[in-house]
Amino acid sequence: VRSRRQRQMCIRDRLYGAGKIGGFCHLYIGQEAVVIGILSSINSEDTVITAYRDHGHILARGVDPKLVMSELTGRKDGISKGKGGSMHMFSKANRFYGGHGIVGAQVPLGVGIGFAHKYRNEKKISRVYLGDGAMSNGQVFEAFNLASLWELPVLFIIENNKYGMGTSIGRSAAGGELYERATVFGIKGEKVDGMNFFNVSESAIRAREYIEKNSKPYIIEMDTYRFRGHSMSDPGLYRTKDEVNKMKEIDPVLMMKETLLNDYKIQEDTIKDIESDIKKQIKDVEKFSLESPLPDLKELYTEVYL
């Protein structure tokens, strides 16, 4: 819920519309079940790398929301010192290696991290997230090949939200399921309902057991959906309101709320208290991010390598 609230805050006029958030901003609204469900199998020492829709991922790694929002607003206290913005968030302490703006570029890097885990004999898994739009990139196939060839502890997670920017998956990808493209390299995998937290959780546990038992990579295709446009500047004219509204009927956050109420008999008042507490936390996060100082000009020259 905190992830959803923080994403919605980006939409408000006083932040993105008022120019408080600069550059691009890719929201994760609708896809929360993927990153939260994966947590069921994650080891605190595992590493995570993803593309530019990274807000939900870094929050799930336990990074303070104040640091995340301060990065969005380009402040000194941001997790990347205000220099990364929405798309380039990193936290070595939380083993989160980005936040990458180039489609598919994070995949070979994630395989490299997996190689490091194996080389150092670490009992860790490199979790590599990528979108459906990256699944036709050559470097992704090269990464699949090396991960399989070297038997690396890598879990590839495809967040198939049906659109690569404004291009539907049906117009960009021929053949069968996306995860099956990795099978030619000997990588086993499956496709899962990525709008259902419990399905995601079960698949993540299966994946971890397979990787640990066989010392080989695994791939999961998460069938999910983004409720907002590709980025804040995208009006989403390539899909109908009916399509979006139909998908909102299986909103993972609302579905989880219904499950807690009906199956786990959690009281409505308890959920309201949680939501109220999160709203207060988010107000504090917003206040902190806007009061944080801007980076010093000398930061322009730090972390620059020639």
Regions found by a protein language model. Give the residues of each.
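A short, conserved beta-to-alpha structural element at the edge of catalytic cores
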Residues: 150-170
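Short beta-alpha connecting loops at secondary-structure transitions
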Residues: 162-167, 187-192, 237-245, 270
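Short, conserved beta-strand edge motifs with alternating hydrophobic and charged residues
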Residues: 157-158, 190-193, 200, 219-223
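Glycine/aspartate-rich loop-and-adjacent alpha/beta segment that forms the canonical ThDP
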Residues: 210-306
